[in-house]
């Protein structure tokens, strides 16, 4: 017999946090979370790890906009 308790796995918890960041914190459509843009993937991963710091949702929104804008500017 194994001592594993039924419940969410680490991957499920991570996916749940990811959906929370997209839908609640950033207020983005679900389609955005499935986008393959490298900046979105990187920033969503970063925000998911920072899940305890969501006091100011506007700061996260502005940070994401800034990172997308920086990535799109030509040098």
Swiss-Prot record:
GO terms under cellular component: host cell nucleus; viral capsid
Gene Ontology biological-process annotations: viral process
InterPro entries, A to Z: HV_small_capsid (IPR031385)
Principal subcellular localization: virion
Localization in the cell: Virion; Host nucleus
Keyword terms of this UniProt record: Capsid protein, Host nucleus, Virion
Pfam families reported in the protein's UniProt record: HV_small_capsid
Transmembrane spans: none
Entry similarity comment: Belongs to the herpesviridae small capsomere-interacting protein family.
Quaternary structure (record): Interacts with the major capsid protein/MCP.
Free-text function comment from the UniProt entry: Participates in the assembly of the infectious particles by decorating the outer surface of the capsid shell and thus forming a layer between the capsid and the tegument. Complexes composed of the major capsid protein and small capsomere-interacting protein/SCP assemble together in the host cytoplasm and are translocated to the nucleus, where they accumulate and participate in capsid assembly.
Descriptive protein name: Small capsomere-interacting protein
The organism's taxonomic lineage, starting at the top: Viruses, Duplodnaviria, Heunggongvirae, Peploviricota, Herviviricetes
